[in-house]
Amino acid sequence: MSILSYFQQQRLTLQSGTALPAAQSLLTLAGQGELEATLNPKPDAAALLAAIEQAYQDGYEQQASTEFELQGIAFAGSGDPLLALELLSQVLPAFKAQRHGVPVTLVTYGLVAAAEAEQLCQQLIALEVERLEIYLPAANPPAYQQAVKPLQYGFAEVCQFIHAAAEAGLQVSCFAFAPAEQPAEIRALARELGARELLILQPEK
């Protein structure tokens, strides 16, 4: 059976297709290949909205007493949500109409053409995306190239996108998987670019 949603650190997370800008999915890097194998490769908007609604009916986030405690929903899965904008543009307006004030996060490589970064950020804001979690496993181009193996763009573009997103008013966090090389340098770079924090996540064994 293929699924459309799962819980990652207790947050409802949705599959966003299979298009990737790099050699491997972030789920694979997180050691979650088994989960990835169960995800529906071609999610459609109606099915995603139904999966979200079902999670809320089953009690998701009922413990949150204020908006500030809401984790909301995230788009991640076996693809990169920035390469699934058409799907997001079908899901998010309907979701926000039903659940106003619930935050939306995209978990992404952030590999975007520098010339398109600003416009893309405005598009995300128009879709009421509040947060971005961007994979930043290195603080220099060679180490980034080795860690990510991007199919298009690279270190300069991800740095530009982090900066553009923070400037546009999106809440940006960066993350890497343990054991990260030079975490202090990555954290300093992330902060310099405008990210709020660098999270070092433990991959599943």
Each PLM stretch: what is its role?
Residues M1-E69:
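N-terminal [4Fe-4S]-dependent radical SAM core
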Residues L85-S89, A115-I125, A184-I186:
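Distinct, well-ordered alpha-helical segments
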Residues A45-I52, Q90-V91, F155-F161:
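Well-ordered, non-membrane alpha-helical segments in soluble/globular domains
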Residues I52-Y60, A115-V129:
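Short amphipathic alpha-helices and their capping/turn segments at secondary-structure boundaries
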